[in-house]
Amino acid sequence: MIDAVIFDLDGVLVDSESLWDQSRREVVEETGGRWLPDATEAMLGMSSTEWSAFLHDRLGVPLPPDEISDTVVERVLAHYRERLPLVPGAVAAVRRMAERARLGLASSANRPVIDAALALAEVDNLFEVTVSSEEVARGKPAPDVYLEAARRMAVSPAVCAVIEDSANGIRSGLAAGMTVVAIPNPHFAPPPELLRSAAAVLSTIDDLTPEVLT
């Protein structure tokens, strides 16, 4: 019996991976760092603490990690204020699921980005709890952010369903002992063997209905 549905944000509700990628690339290039071919995929699911350290340590950005994070986040927020890149069908899916279960959100995005995205989408009132990876010890694929969401909602992980798109996100939900519904990221598709561990694999978020969880 699923009592709570915990959504990821980037790639599930908001098509923002390209904006994060663009903003990080700009900071690397403008400060004299060097972008690596595997950088985008390596940072999927990382918390802000982790990816800002990655830009500093691996990509050679000569700024303190806190400043790197603040600079990237401000650029992403500026894009959101111009136009929030919602995944088609995301708002309707959130509203459908809110009629069936309590909702939470567990994201690698920074707190200001989470709050802005949900407010601009006008669904912030539907989520009981939202957790940023910067508020826990470890980012995805560690289970911390999902376990913290369950703790704040006062529910057992066993009655939670996770809605995820990325390999690290799926691993995080599975490690938390939760039911995972995968909507594979079309740009960085999770490996087939990992998708087989999900309770359901959907083509798009339009396919997410309460019946999927029964």
Q: Which residues are covered by each model-predicted region?
A:
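Active-site neighborhood of HAD-like aspartate-dependent phosphohydrolases
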Residues: 1-42
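Asp-based, Mg2+/Mn2+-dependent phosphohydrolase catalytic module
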Residues: 1-3, 95, 111-214
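Conserved phosphate-coupling serine/threonine residues in phosphotransfer and NTP-handling enzymes
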Residues: 12, 107-109, 184
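Conserved SAM-binding loop
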Residues: 13, 86, 103-106, 138, ...
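Helix-loop "lid/cap" segments that line or gate small-molecule binding pockets
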Residues: 25-28, 47-62, 117, 150
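Metal-dependent phosphoesterase signature
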Residues: 34, 54-92
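Short, acidic loop-to-helix structural element flanking the phosphoryl-transfer center
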Residues: 78-105, 111-115
